[in-house]
């Protein structure tokens, strides 16, 4: 497996351009190169499909995605991760600006340095693979913000990795769509982080669709503060191997979370969703619904865990 060999090989073969985040992630992965399938969140994973995901040759090169639909949609801000375009949009009522590289590195280091290697294996793999040009960090504030569309894509015969970090300031309302596009016979690793401040609302849609023999591991990490609202709708289909890991933390309680998910499988595909919702304070609200359509010999998996304070 190409990726596992890269993890376990000598430090002498690691590039001098490797970032501190990549080195920390690599050190942690070396203690647990492959997740233990006895762990609940990995127990039902199809081993042969997972191994195939890890066997792709990795690249950080950018490829123009084949985006379906209209190419010039009015009043939508489209961002393609890896395109290397500067982002700074400001109007009277709102602002979207990039986080500084140091802010991004400090944030990621804080999140991964004490992370459990099994529960956070997918994030660690992503951060080991992703270089700086495939990481986007945004700070969003205000109201009447036009919808954001964020594109991640993989390239035929390669594994690509992308990271997204978004901080949503207080009293902000925003709608964000993530479109994950898997080219045929490819693999895509995505880690997304959203910090939602007090009295803010994030309407979040995720559409992940692939072509023949496409693969994806997609992790979503959300922190909600008091009186915030997070509304997630997700759709996954046409992936030979697809995995969505949702981790939501109501940091102080008193927040509202709505999750609606749909996954569609055919032939011998496997698509899985794992949702972990933590309430670290009183008066939290959760409404969660996940639906699956599984045809032929395919497998559709959903597991949910709710953690409440003692």
Predicted segments with their positions:
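Glycine-rich and polybasic anion-binding loops at the starts of cofactor/ligand-binding domains
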Residues: 1-290, 301
